[in-house]
A protein has these predicted regions:
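Structural motif
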Residues: 63, 87-90, 111, 235, ...
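Conserved AMP-binding/adenylation subdomain of ANL enzymes
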Residues: 214-234, 239-272
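Conserved AMP-binding/adenylate-forming core of the ANL superfamily
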Residues: 3-10, 14, 22-75, 92-97, ...
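Structural core segment of the AMP-binding/adenylate-forming
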Residues: 52, 80-165
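Conserved pre-ATP/AMP-binding loop-to-beta segment of ANL
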Residues: 6, 22, 142-146, 150-157, ...
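Short hydrophobic alpha-helices that are characteristic scaffold elements of the AMP-binding
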Residues: 75-80, 101-102, 240, 252-253
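Conserved S/T- and glycine-rich ATP-binding loop of Class I adenylate-forming
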Residues: 60, 77, 190, 196-199, ...
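Conserved G/P- and acidic residue-centered "switch" motifs that form tight phosphate/ATP-binding loops
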Residues: 81, 199, 255
């Protein structure tokens, strides 16, 4: 397999959409998304991020299970040079607050509830202003850097915007503005902050660069002899390195298909496989 020319995640997705545009990139249940469709959604999300003032170097947190929206958000964040802060879906309320504050997240893309845990209610408990303010202008002393909260599952109230409403903002920024932002991204720039489990102390943020994720991922795929004909079942969490910094770039750099399982369930896994 030929090593991709791209050295940043945004460029990598563009490269794959050109060379393998109609090929299926993502499978989630009955939904199939091609590389071209993935890129289109990423570009819309990236322009929407620019519309709310997210810029190169800003931290944007993602709190979600293994879903296409996680991957759309992550690559959109990377495409404009911002840093995707992956939050564990096993986080306690204290750990969630710690990760958002410690990373200085300017925006949060989230599922309101995951496996029965109401994360949005936990944020409201710390930040009652969330229910009283306007979207994209959130201001709370508990999370002083956070200005934008977007829910994937559509819950809206006060400063909370839905995924669809946020995506509709993409028309406020041109394709040229996105290209300018993308051109500013350096291969050595940080693309991910992935947090450790926090078993011995508070979770620690580990910074990973675009080039390192791509190069390491390609080499992993080479050792596994992956090709564009392969499908990779991905049930390990994307918020940890095995998911987003190992399995994901390994299959993506080889043009294969990612089959997402939202969270591990043995019976469901056998059906998917």
């Amino acid at each position: 397999m030929i090593r991709p020319k791209s050295k940043t995640l945004g460029d990598l997705l563009d490269e794959m959409s050109v060379t393998r545009g109609s090929q299926t990139a993502l499978v989630f249940g009955d939904v199939n998304i091609s590389f071209s469709e993935w890129r289109k959604e990423v570009d819309k999300f990236a322009r929407s991020l620019l519309s709310v003032g997210i810029k190169h170097g800003d931290r944007v947190a993602v709190l979600a299970s293994n879903r296409p929206e996680w991957l759309i958000a992550a690559f959109a964040i990377a495409k404009i040079g911002a840093v995707m802060t992956a939050v564990s879906t096993f986080s306690t309320s204290r750990e969630l607050n710690w990760c958002l504050n410690q990373s200085g997240a300017a925006a949060l893309i989230m599922l309101s509830k995951i496996r029965g845990q109401d994360f949005l209610a936990e944020i409201r408990a710390d930040c009652p202003e969330l229910s009283e303010q306007q979207p994209f202008a959130f201001d709370s002393p508990a999370l002083p850097e956070l200005k934008t909260v977007i829910t994937i599952d559509g819950e809206t109230e006060g400063a909370i915007a839905s995924w669809s409403d946020f995506m509709n903002r993409n028309s406020l920024y041109s394709e040229e503005a996105l290209l300018d932002a993308q051109a500013s991204v350096n291969p050595e720039d940080i693309c991910y902050i992935l947090y450790t489990s926090g078993s011995t102390a508070s979770p620690k943020g580990v910074m990973l660069a675009h080039k390192g994720v791509i190069e390491n991922g390609f080499d992993i795929g080479e050792r596994q002899h992956l090709t564009e004909k392969d499908r990779l079942w991905l049930a390990v969490p994307l918020f940890w390195s095995f998911g987003s910094a190992n399995a994901l770039p390994a299959i993506m750099t080889h043009g294969g298909t990612i089959v997402l399982q939202e969270s591990f369930d043995a019976d469901r896994a056998l059906t998917i496989i």
